[in-house]
Amino acid sequence: KAGRGPESDLAQAQEMHARRDEVPAALDRLCAELAQRGVKMGSHDDQTAEGRGLWRARGVTLAEFPETQEAAEAAHGAGDAVIMGAPNVVRGGSHNGNLSALDLISMGLCHALASDYHYPSPRRAALMLAQSGLLDLAGAWALVSSGPAQVLGLTDRGTLAPGKRADIVLLDKAT
């Protein structure tokens, strides 16, 4: 589709590899510009406290799907939000052996659950958390409603309250 052949693809990959030392400074500039514009930024798959700290220094205050407890604790300890995938909860763990969302939730280190690649998972995750007794229903539902709204700064939604944007879904316990 790009109209290139294997030789030009290889040349492009080699050129990008040769410029890899430019990446940190480019990220610094990009993050500074986005922060100046008020854009919420998140890191993905943080593995270490040090790596999480580098992102935080750039103004990146959301840690999405940290891969280790160390990275999640570093984010939480610095006041950054930790977001995990609802499918991780539904499956009972990470699909690739990384950190379990259930573990972070039980430690109070997860601020929000995201649908990730499977839109039915937030509802299922909240209900599973409540049924398991790990959280009460209100606490479990907050991870898929008010939690995501808060971490994204969406103060006009996330709770059922006068003047706020909201959708309401009625769930039948029997089904």
Regions found by a protein language model. Name each.
Residues A78-N88, G92-K173:
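His/Asp/Glu-enriched, well-ordered alpha-helical/loop segment
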Residues K1-V82, S94-L109:
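Histidine/acidic residue-rich metal-binding segments in metalloenzymes
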